[in-house]
């Protein structure tokens, strides 16, 4: 029951309040800082819980007055208000009880790759990347292209970007997976609809403290950068490929003229990929995580279809269909499907709290 989850939180909050006024804690900066942070983390839940307990107590008292000739009607009216307040507060508390994702406020690496569909897939990589960039502008985020591999028709075989801004991961973490597009290519004279697919990966930016790589586990190869059609971009071995031997995860980087800069970029993306792989492994072992996530985030999972002839966007994970595809893509109005995904994840998590 909800009340059983709240009692220890309130007890701990009151205990910390008492400790923070003690001489021993006030004279210990480290302990004072730790306790103050812990109290701050649970303050909203504790205060709402105390209000909730008070409402429950008032409900009991008013129910006892229902048979009273003089106060019965008044108690009945007050019960309606109390039950309504109780229901509202329960929903607020359940939201507060959802475990915070430690990555939610981090910057992200956005990686989009063309899959099946040839040139059309590459064109859609560009279209979706532009939509993400427009969305980032609306959120006041910054987008920095780390690496891009353009095709010959104005799209990309692959693009990797660093998206910087508060809440970037929390908003975009459900974008990982396979995105399918259905539309008539400009070169299609018969008007036939082609289906192609691209993959998106969302990886939180990590620092050295969060993921530690043993240099002995890395294989570093250098080679000459290659341009379109295989021509050499420069005559020095500036391109870098770093392979993490234990996992086989590999990152190549050749956008910079400096080998050192390419190596630095490749290492940052490698760390993000290793961290992502670690998160996926943890989620696979954690039953609660499996219940609360919206899809697996796995690149092989088809999460969304963009049907241009019907102006239709469908998210298969939550059964959401919108008939405003062009407006959403061109305007960067991705909250049209991002917000329902977040709401669904919260609903799933709240359901777990009730169990």
Curated annotation (Swiss-Prot):
<comment type="function">
    <text>Peptide chain release factor 1 directs the termination of translation in response to the peptide chain termination codons UAG and UAA.</text>
</comment>
<feature type="modified residue" description="N5-methylglutamine">
    <location>
        <position position="231"/>
    </location>
</feature>
<feature type="region of interest" description="Disordered">
    <location>
        <begin position="283"/>
        <end position="303"/>
    </location>
</feature>
<dbReference type="InterPro" id="IPR050057">
    <property type="entry name" value="Prokaryotic/Mito_RF"/>
</dbReference>
<dbReference type="GO" id="GO:0016149">
    <property type="term" value="F:translation release factor activity, codon specific"/>
</dbReference>
<keyword id="KW-0963">Cytoplasm</keyword>
<dbReference type="Pfam" id="PF00472">
    <property type="entry name" value="RF-1"/>
</dbReference>
<dbReference type="InterPro" id="IPR000352">
    <property type="entry name" value="Pep_chain_release_fac_I"/>
</dbReference>
<dbReference type="InterPro" id="IPR005139">
    <property type="entry name" value="PCRF"/>
</dbReference>
<dbReference type="Pfam" id="PF03462">
    <property type="entry name" value="PCRF"/>
</dbReference>
<comment type="similarity">
    <text>Belongs to the prokaryotic/mitochondrial release factor family.</text>
</comment>
<dbReference type="GO" id="GO:0005737">
    <property type="term" value="C:cytoplasm"/>
</dbReference>
<dbReference type="InterPro" id="IPR004373">
    <property type="entry name" value="RF-1"/>
</dbReference>
<dbReference type="InterPro" id="IPR045853">
    <property type="entry name" value="Pep_chain_release_fac_I_sf"/>
</dbReference>
<keyword id="KW-0488">Methylation</keyword>
<keyword id="KW-0648">Protein biosynthesis</keyword>
<protein>
    <recommendedName>
        <fullName>Peptide chain release factor 1</fullName>
    </recommendedName>
</protein>
């Amino acid at each position: 029951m909800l009340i059983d989850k709240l009692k220890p939180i309130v007890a701990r909050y009151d205990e910390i309040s008492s400790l923070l006024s003690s001489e021993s804690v006030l004279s210990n900066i480290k302990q004072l800082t730790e306790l103050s942070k812990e109290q701050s983390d649970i303050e909203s839940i504790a205060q709402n819980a105390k209000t909730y307990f008070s409402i429950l107590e008032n409900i009991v008292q008013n129910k006892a007055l229902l048979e009273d000739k003089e106060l019965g009607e008044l108690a009945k009216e007050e019960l309606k208000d109390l039950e309504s307040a109780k229901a509202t507060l329960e929903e607020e508390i359940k939201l507060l009880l959802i475990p915070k994702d430690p990555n939610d406020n981090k910057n992200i690496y956005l990686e989009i790759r063309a899959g099946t569909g040839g040139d059309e897939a590459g064109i859609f990589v560009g279209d979706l990347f532009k939509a993400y960039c427009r969305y980032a502008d609306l959120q006041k985020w910054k987008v920095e292209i780390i690496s891009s591999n353009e095709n010959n028709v104005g799209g990309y075989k692959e693009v990797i970007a660093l998206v910087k801004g508060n809440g970037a991961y929390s908003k975009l973490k459900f974008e990982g997976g396979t995105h399918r597009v259905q539309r008539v290519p400009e070169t299609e004279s018969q008007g036939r609809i082609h289906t192609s697919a691209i993959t998106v990966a969302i990886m939180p930016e990590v620092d050295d403290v969060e993921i530690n790589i043993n240099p002995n586990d890395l294989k570093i190869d250098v080679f000459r950068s290659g341009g379109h059609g295989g021509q050499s971009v420069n005559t020095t071995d500036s391109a870098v490929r770093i392979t993490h031997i234990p996992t086989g995860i590999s990152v190549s980087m050749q956008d910079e003229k400096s080998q050192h800069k390419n190596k630095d970029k490749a290492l940052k993306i490698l760390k993000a990929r290793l961290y992502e792989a670690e998160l996926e492994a943890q989620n696979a072992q954690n039953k609660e995580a499996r219940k609360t996530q919206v899809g697996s985030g796995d690149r092989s999972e088809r999460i969304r279809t963009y049907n241009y002839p019907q102006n239709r966007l469908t998210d298969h994970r939550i059964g959401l269909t919108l008939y405003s595809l062009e407006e959403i893509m061109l305007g960067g109005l991705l909250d049209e499907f991002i917000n329902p995904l977040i709401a669904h994840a919260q609903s799933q998590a709240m359901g777990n709290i009730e169990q």
